[in-house]
Amino acid sequence: MTLAQVLPGTTLPLPEEAADNAFSVLTPIFAVSGGGLLLSQLTEMTGLSPTTIQNWVKRGWVSKPVNKKYGELQVARILLINLLRPAMQLDKIAALLSYVNGSVEDRSDDIIPEPALYNMVCAGLFAMERERTIHHEFVITLIGAQLEGYEGPVLGAKERLSDALAVMLLNIAAATLMQQADAIYEQMCPMR
């Protein structure tokens, strides 16, 4: 499995030090942007169209921007959706994220902040790439190690998070394999 050399879900270059805390790459951007990113900045960073992001907000998959700015929680959620959408239907992605963190507008029902979830997904992807495996057993072992010591705010939170991470990592791996298969196909049967 080979991931592009960009920060997952973005068009930004991937620094080597991002392996354990991928979302920290965005900290300087938030520091100079006055508490959030404008839609134009977010579209440039993700490669998504403005209407796509606005549609996700309209559908309730991402909380509304505050003063036209998207904060860290919103950006992390957008990056997660962007990562998952090549191999998963958008309504299933929304349901999966709700399974983890409940209502997008209510932080009190979250079992993990979205930036931390994004970091866990990225760390899992980097480990899968490093070990060159996408076996389900490896993914489960990896998630178990990631969640060691995690105490969720509600009963069953650790199991919910573990299940959701497995679905996310395997879907992203599937998307990567689909891209590789498409590239091979294009070499075999180029468009005429």
Regions found by a protein language model. Give the residues of each.
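Intrinsically disordered, low-complexity, charge-dense segments enriched in Lys/Arg
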Residues: 102-192
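Basic helix-turn-helix/winged-helix DNA-binding cores
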Residues: 1-101
